C-alpha cells in the first residue's frame, strides 16, 4: 500500500458514509439509485469473497469487512426501511445487461495462469468485480440526469467516488513507474470509470464556481 491507495480508500469509505448519513438524516433515499447500490454490493461481495482465505493485513481485512457491511446496510435502507421514498419511476436502468456483459468479459480475460479450481474461481470473480465497478455508477448518473436537480450530499457522494478513482489511477501510475506493475484490466476499467464521471464533474465544478445548485441537463 502507498499514500495514493490509502487516500483513495479513505475517499471511497467517505463517499459510502456520506451516502449513509444522507439517507439516515433525511429518512429518505430520494435521488439515490437502488440499481447502482445493488451493483456496488455485488462488486464488494465478488471481490472480497476471499475474506477468510486470503489474509494480507489487518487494514485490508478491516476495509473489506467495512465495505461489505456498509454496502449491505445501505441496500437495506433503500430497499426496505425507506422504500416508500425510493424513486422507482426514474431508476429503471436494466442492470442485468451490465452484469451479464461483465460476467462474460471476465470469463474471457481473467488471468489464465491461476492454478486450482478455487483460485481460478476467485480470480474470475475479482476480474468481474473490476469490470462491474467501472460502470456501476451508470444507473445513478442516469437517475440524476432524469430528475435534474442534485442534492448537495448526493453530489458530494459522487465527487468523493470520483476522487477515489483518481487517486487509484495515481496509485497505478506509481506502481508501474517504480515496481514494473502490469494491471491492464484495472487501468482500462479505471479510465472508463473516470470518463463516466467527467461530465458530472464539469457541471459540479460549474455550479460551485457560480455558487448555484447543481442541475444536470435532461
Curated annotation (Swiss-Prot):
GO annotation, biological process: protein retention in ER lumen; protein transport; vesicle-mediated transport
Subcellular location: Endoplasmic reticulum membrane
PROSITE patterns for the chain: ER_LUMEN_RECEPTOR_1
A Pfam cross-reference name: ER_lumen_recept
Primary localization: endoplasmic reticulum
Segments on the Cytoplasmic face: 24-57, 116-123, 174-184
Record-level GO cellular component terms: cis-Golgi network; endoplasmic reticulum; endoplasmic reticulum membrane
Residues annotated as signal peptide: none
Lumenal side: 1-2, 79-94, 145-152, 206-218
Function comment: Required for the retention of luminal endoplasmic reticulum proteins. Determines the specificity of the luminal ER protein retention system. Also required for normal vesicular traffic through the Golgi.
Membership in a protein family: Belongs to the ERD2 family.
PANTHER family registered for this protein in UniProt: ER LUMEN PROTEIN RETAINING RECEPTOR (PTHR10585)
Protein name: ER lumen protein-retaining receptor
Organism: Dictyostelium discoideum (Social amoeba)
